[in-house]
Amino acid sequence: MSTDHVSTHPDSPLHGNGIGSEAINLAAIRQEYTKGGLKEGDLPDNPLSLFNRWLHEAIDAQVDEPTAMLVGTVSPEGQPSTRTVLLKDLHDGKFIFYTNYESRKGTHLAKNPYISLSFVWHALERQVHIEGIASKVPAGESDTYFRQRPYKSRIGARISPQSRPLKSRMQLIRNFVAEAARWVGREVERPAHWGGYAVTPHRIEFWQGRANRLHDRFLYSLQPDGSWQKERLAP
């Protein structure tokens, strides 16, 4: 992760005399990475084993939102888009998350299933970057997870036209109240437009911060026979 690529243009408001604030020099903001390193001899043959270890270490370290990941998709026109989503399962070698299928990411994935996932654990000076292909999970699996969600989250999933223009927050609240009234005393059903994606990875990179920006980076690439090739990358 680099903090050196920043705008220092003199016309930037960060260098101006903002009302009630002082100028900020972004180029001077940096930190040294001292938490440790990553050695070739410590790498397992399967990257999912290392990911599991790092994720559990992030959870044990009480990192904020340890399952948060930046999900990248691309529109049919080639326009990239990212957003933060929570990892909800890692099953059979696949990374699973849930969302609105009619959202921007859902419409992207319907046309182009290639996807990227990035985990950043600042407190541990670690990142994991994943590239793969997304596919919808079976409806039964989405139903099972939906039933585990808090009641109000289930109602919200039913009424939110995710990624589309909304007249006002009050309209969203009215829709929520009306939908909740429809399900009093009944099990809230999963709407057809909401469900899970399973990401099958073919490229996983592990990044560990090191002193002097000489970071450790190791890339796992999936091979035709199902094995993973490991190689060190320059920082």
UniProtKB/Swiss-Prot annotation:
What the entry lists under Pfam families is as follows: PNP_phzG_C, PNPOx_N
What does the record give under GO molecular function?
A: FMN binding; pyridoxamine phosphate oxidase activity
Reported cofactor(s)? FMN
Q: Which reaction does it catalyse?
A: pyridoxamine 5'-phosphate + O2 + H2O = pyridoxal 5'-phosphate + H2O2 + NH4(+); pyridoxine 5'-phosphate + O2 = pyridoxal 5'-phosphate + H2O2
- Known SUPFAM superfamilies for this protein? FMN-binding split barrel
Q: In which pathway does it act?
A: Cofactor metabolism; pyridoxal 5'-phosphate salvage; pyridoxal 5'-phosphate from pyridoxamine 5'-phosphate: step 1/1; Cofactor metabolism; pyridoxal 5'-phosphate salvage; pyridoxal 5'-phosphate from pyridoxine 5'-phosphate: step 1/1
The record's Gene3D superfamilies line, in alphabetical order, gives:
Electron Transport, Fmn-binding Protein, Chain A
Q: Which cysteines are joined by disulfide bonds?
A: none
Q: What class of enzyme is it?
A: oxidoreductase
Which residues does substrate bind?
Answer: R30, Q31, E32, Y33, K88, Y145, R149, S153, R213, L214, H215
Positions contributing to FMN binding: 83-88, 98-99, 104-105, 127, 162-163, 207, 217
- So which domain of life are we looking at? Bacteria
As recorded in UniProt, its EC number(s) are 1.4.3.5
Q: How is the cofactor bound?
A: Binds 1 FMN per subunit.
Q: Which UniProt keywords apply?
A: Flavoprotein, FMN, Oxidoreductase, Pyridoxine biosynthesis
- Complexes and interactors: Homodimer.
NCBIfam families tied to this protein: pdxH (TIGR00558), PRK05679.1 (NF004231)
State the similarity comment: Belongs to the pyridoxamine 5'-phosphate oxidase family.
Biological role stated in the UniProt entry: Catalyzes the oxidation of either pyridoxine 5'-phosphate (PNP) or pyridoxamine 5'-phosphate (PMP) into pyridoxal 5'-phosphate (PLP).
This protein is called: Pyridoxine/pyridoxamine 5'-phosphate oxidase
